[in-house]
């Protein structure tokens, strides 16, 4: 469904079914809006437009992860990759309250974030979600807590693995500062071009360190969405990304 090509030392991920902008380039910044007040409803749309603006002005790859209720409105409005925050391993049928991959695709999602520490999945369910998402034409980013867990989920062939030590998520110390060796290990074991890192990422220095260690991008949330000045933070992150 997806293929990766190298253009001027950048990786570009192409999809025949890409919904909102044509491609996602690596390295990238992926910002999860979670269920923060600043990242829901009208505020979510404004935040998404800001991300699109910075991506265009600075010529970098930025994607966003939004809640189900905001997804369609945002995907229709912006031309950057829009991810869903999760899904269920089901198709159409008697599945009250469930969200299917086909529904996400129809609402304009580019991809789906799976197995986040705040929304973990059993391995069997995770494998089924990745398979169904792939069949629907969605790009999959699977979160893991370590390179070792990444080795386990790699067999499901997700498009990208996001390594996030749970103890650092939402904290003041980033994975780039606390455990750079873990980033190197993840890239070595899971493959260059397959790994992004997260947990505590909040500034350009974290981005530069992560990319220098071989990561293909960063995943963050509160560092942008809850910042006093999200635009200033995004510009700092994007400036670091431009060097790669």
Model-derived features: positions:
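Conserved N-terminal beta1-alpha1 strand-loop-helix module at the mouth
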Residues: 13-99, 140, 148-157, 226
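Conserved, mostly hydrophobic/aromatic
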Residues: 34, 67, 104, 164, ...
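Active-site-adjacent beta->alpha loops and helix N-cap segments on the catalytic face
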Residues: 40-46, 68-76, 92-101, 117-132, ...
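Glycine-rich beta-to-alpha transition loops that act as phosphate-gripper elements at the mouths
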Residues: 85-89, 93-95, 122-124, 142-147, ...
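Non-catalytic positions within long, well-ordered alpha-helices that form the structural scaffold/packing
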Residues: 97, 105-106, 134, 154, ...
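Glycine-rich phosphate-binding active-site loops on the catalytic face of alpha/beta enzymes
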Residues: 111-121, 161-173, 213-233
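Catalytic cores of alpha/beta
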Residues: 145-157, 201-218
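Short loop-to-alpha-helix "cap/lid" segments that border enzyme active sites
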Residues: 154-163, 174-193
